[in-house]
Amino acid sequence: MKKLFLGQFVPIFLTLITFLVLSTILYGILIVLNSMHLSVPIVLDFRKREVLIGMSIYLKTAIDFAIFMGNLMHANPGWKKRVAIEIGTAVGNGIGTFLVLIVWTLFKEVPILMIIMIFIASVVLLRMAEESLEEFLKQKKSFIQIRMPVGLLQDQLNFVNTLFRPILRFFVPNLNLTNAKKLSFANLIVFSFTIPFILGLDDFAGYIPLFSVINVFGFALGVMLGHMILTMGLFAFPKITVKVVKHPFVLIVGALAFIGIGLYGFWESAKILLSII
């Protein structure tokens, strides 16, 4: 009973507390932004519609996050390590959300900043897609019929990622999606912060157009609520999560999701660049 309490209830309770703390910080940030006499003040209210839209946008990367977190939990067992993973992933997701709001509010007239962030995030996502396909190819008895096209796709990704290796090394020197390493408590917090933060940056492409038609406060709450619900599910059923994220079908779908989001990010970067030339 004690093991169950420490292994599941404590991390899940901490997930809820972290959500409430980050929501309070979000509210405070929006108050500060409103104090700057913006041309269009931010409405500090929300409706269910905005919250649901935010959750939907977040869950677009749910497969990606589940793969990352499931492998991280598998490589770092124990309730203390789960606490570190929760803190890192929640703060990473929260800060990514805050950054989207701040950049949109203060720097929407400086599109070059958005181009750089979207481009870097897209490069990282292609590297993560390659690692998913590498893990799939290691499972030699699964989905034999599609191993050849998957191998060809993995080779193409390897070629592209080789070109971008300096960028990958500079921003995420130890990024590895499917072979997470055992880390200390402090290092685990830092590492588990990185991927949710990077995935959040790539969502600039989807977030920014929405901010002109929806309430950003409700949208941001929805993003963080989606993260909280997904994290609780992962903590409540860790063994199932590990089996699921190692399944060949999930690896393929996750890789395709990474590629799709990454290519969309490149497309959005090009569109923004062409609009300012």
Annotate the PLM regions.
Residues 1-277:
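Multi-pass alpha-helical transmembrane bundle typical of ion/small-solute transporters
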